[in-house]
Design a protein with these regions (language model features):
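Gram-negative outer-membrane beta-barrel transporters
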Residues: 26-27, 389, 528-538, 555-636
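Outer membrane beta-barrel strand-and-loop segments of large Gram-negative receptors
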Residues: 372-379, 418, 505-509, 515, ...
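Short acidic/polar hinge/loop motifs at secondary-structure boundaries
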Residues: 111-140
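Flexible loop and strand-edge segments within Gram-negative outer membrane beta-barrel domains
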Residues: 258-264, 277-344, 351-374, 405-407, ...
Length: 706
């Protein structure tokens, strides 16, 4: 398996040894330094109106308004996006019902190299405060970034490795905000300086601190309230008055979720060389976060026999917290190759040293470490009569270890080597696209003496027909494969943070799926509409099944492999409905729905229900005013032992004011979320029954750029 690393690392070495030059920035003085042509996650050379990659871009004031402590909660206003929302300190995106190891969170095209895909209680090590642009990709083109993106990808862009030289003066960005629901205070800033006409230095940092989350209504969902009240009655009958009182207090608690505070900070620096023939840059970053892990009332932490007992009385459970940190090095470069068949060589690489500790009070429970590397090389083709594309190699390695009484996964080494290509042909109004990826994966559990190897081939084919000036209809078909993760293969033990006993299966085969997708995009001078329908048929779909059994007073979740079917739709529309006094009055709406069933009739757990969101926005040169209503349906299509979730209606409003006329350099935002303080729960969340969404949240944000 060592040879798997040789090819991409050799290519990386060639590029690092080559002279790195890049085109100097030739934009005028009035141009915004950060304004760039749209970047499409599939590759920068592919049209934004493509078939295989359904891309949503979030940036600017929209990103500033929606920023939360984790990227999952930041993106939930986008079509087809929900979040795991385990706690304010840990929330990952859910795309089309997919989460975990089927969604990749990327940092400029390569993985976050953390442990957030392993378990829902692990936070993403990218602070949204440092992110300038987010691209959400659904559809088969995401497979170019690995089989772990079989459900989609979220690509986060910062400017730690500069793409252009700031003109005339250093470039400074800053953002600061306050949110009332958790007394959330945050600030971030970045600075780019041209040390020479070809050398750019970058520094950035961020800080965030929040308290316990305030919520509308009862903390516990009705069914869990009943369970806790029954448990309190049993404790009272047995004479355990203190335990009964604690359970009664938890059952009737309103207004907040205990142990959900978060304290995090980041620091980073980068250096980039930019000239006419290419560019090369390197960045070093550090991420540190400490956050509370809310626990289900009545759930007991796992202890070794006799531990936590004295004189026959059970010791009071201490709060669980996670201390997380990551050091990371990133490299990005490209070389112009001239006018041959390939016109550009791109490289992207990263190494990270990650660890987090799960504490029970002041005592160390379990230590998780993850040392990982990911590298990509891409050769892009020059446009030849409407044909263009790219071909590349990717290597990934993850050395994961867990030490402690509740290490539910043994030490594992995962290595993956892949080759991929994406090709596009434009024939007048007709466009064709094809993508393919082959990857070899090995997962080795050293202490168990088990090593599994998987070969996965994925391919997609799509066609698009353009009609009118800006409208199109596209269809695509795909075949995808995903190797099981180490956690799905080898889990066997109690997991303190999720309060579950997790059991994997080392005999799993690769997960395979066939997919079909159709997209209609209509755009006029005053309106736009995008409709997407999709379906996937899985052979060997892997999921965590709640067995209804208990081990060490914890519910047992067993990973199983079954055939499954998933389908759904996403719809987006916007229109200008009036113009007056220098303002445009616009209306917009989104709708999304996913259905997923296991063969034999069971529903896939944690699938978001139907959602509708509509808004009215008054937009002017200096002032924007917005009001919106989000309606989420009940979710009664649940798996065995999974509880249903009540729907909710939430009203939000915001105002953005730009006091200076010069290029929106200063923006002040005031937003009121969940104005009527409703009790709302996200069905995709593992903790939904005891961690509601934030109640009324008044947020103030200031954003400066010059």
């Amino acid at each position: 398996m060592k040879s798997m690393a040789a090819l991409p690392l050799a290519a990386l070495a060639v590029v690092l040894a080559a002279p790195a030059y890049a085109q100097s920035d030739s934009r005028g003085d009035g141009d915004d330094y950060h304004s760039q042509d749209p970047i499409v996650i599939t590759a920068p050379y592919v049209r934004s109106l493509d078939i295989l990659g359904n891309v949503t871009v979030v940036e600017g004031d929209e990103l500033a308004r929606d920023r939360r402590g984790q990227i999952g909660d930041t993106l939930t206003r986008q079509a087809g996006v929900s979040a795991t929302s385990f706690s304010p300190g840990s929330s990952r995106p859910v795309l089309r019902g997919f989460q975990g190891d089927r969604i990749r969170v990327l940092n400029d095209g390569i993985g976050a190299i953390d442990a957030s895909n392993i378990s829902v209680d692990h936070g993403v090590t990218i602070d949204p405060l440092t992110v300038e642009r987010v691209e959400i990709l659904r559809g088969p083109a995401v497979l170019l970034f690995g089989s772990q993106a079989i459900g989609g990808a979220v690509n986060l862009f910062d400017n730690r490795i500069a793409r252009s030289v700031p003109q005339d003066h250093p470039h400074f960005d800053a953002i600061a905000g306050y949110g009332s629901a958790a007394e959330d205070r945050s600030a971030g800033a970045s600075l780019d300086i041209a040390l020479t006409p070809k050398l750019v230095a970058h520094v950035d940092g961020s800080w965030r601190k929040s308290g316990d989350l305030r919520v509308g209504g009862f903390t516990l969902a009705p069914l869990l309230q009943l369970d806790v009240l029954e448990a309190a009655a049993e404790e009272l009958e047995e004479g355990n008055n203190e335990e009964a009182d604690a359970l009664l207090e938890a059952a009737v608690e309103r207004g907040r979720v205990r142990n959900t505070g978060n304290d995090s900070w980041t620091a980073a620096g980068g250096l980039s060389f930019i000239d006419e023939g290419g560019q090369l840059g390197i960045a070093l970053s550090y991420y540190d976060s400490n956050y509370g892990v809310p626990t289900r009332p009545g759930a007991h932490h796992h202890h070794e026999e006799g531990e936590g007992e004295a004189g026959g009385e059970e010791e009071e459970e201490a709060p669980v917290t996670i201390g997380l940190k990551q050091w990371r090095v990133d490299v990005r470069g490209e070389v112009e190759l001239g006018s041959g068949f390939f016109d550009k060589l791109r490289i992207r690489g990263g190494f990270a040293d990650y660890e987090h500790i799960e504490f029970e009070g002041d005592e160390v429970g379990t230590l998780f470490t993850n040392k990982g590397i990911e590298a990509r090389t891409e050769l892009t083709q020059a446009d030849r009569g409407g044909w263009r594309g790219a071909t590349g190699l990717q290597y990934m390695s993850r050395d994961f270890d867990a030490v402690g009484a509740e290490a539910f996964v043994p030490p594992t080494l995962t290595e993956q080597m892949a080759i991929f290509t994406l090709q596009e042909w434009t024939l007048g109004a007709l466009g064709l696209e094809a993508a393919a990826r082959y990857e070899a994966t090995r997962v080795k559990a050293n202490t168990l003496g088990i090593s599994r190897s998987f070969d996965a081939f994925s391919a997609a084919l799509g066609a698009r027909y353009d009609f009118g000036d800006r409208s199109s209809f596209g269809v695509s078909f795909s075949r995808a494969a995903r190797a099981p993760s180490a956690e799905e293969l080898f889990s066997d033990g109690p997991h303190i943070a999720t309060q579950a006993f997790e059991v994997g299966d080392p005999d799993f085969s690769s997960e395979r799926s066939w997919g079909a997708e159709a997209t209609l995009k209509l755009r006029g001078d005053a309106f736009s509409v995008a409709l997407t329908g999709y379906a996937n048929w899985f052979d060997g779909f892997i999921f965590a099944d709640d067995t209804g059994l208990e081990e060490d007073e914890l519910p047992v979740f067993v990973y199983r492999q079954r055939n499954a079917r998933l389908w759904g739709f996403e719809a987006e529309a916007s229109a200008r409905i009036a113009q007056f006094g220098g303002f445009n009055l616009n209306a917009d709406a989104i709708a999304d729905l996913t259905r997923a069933k296991i063969k034999g009739g069971d529903h896939v757990p944690r699938i978001p229900p139907l959602r509708l969101l509509g808004g009215l926005e008054l937009q002017g040169a200096r002032l924007d005013v917005r009001a919106e209503v989000e309606w989420t349906d009940d979710q009664k299509r649940v798996a065995a032992f999974e509880t249903p979730t009540e729907g909710f209606t939430m009203v939000n409003a915001s105002v953005a004011w730009r006091p200076l006329a010069d290029k929106n350099r200063v923006t002040l935002l005031l937003s009121a979320n969940n104005i009527f303080d409703v009790n709302a729960r996200r069905h995709a969340s593992f903790t939904k029954d005891f961690v509601p969404l934030a109640g009324r949240d008044i947020r103030v944000t200031a954003r400066v750029s010059f």
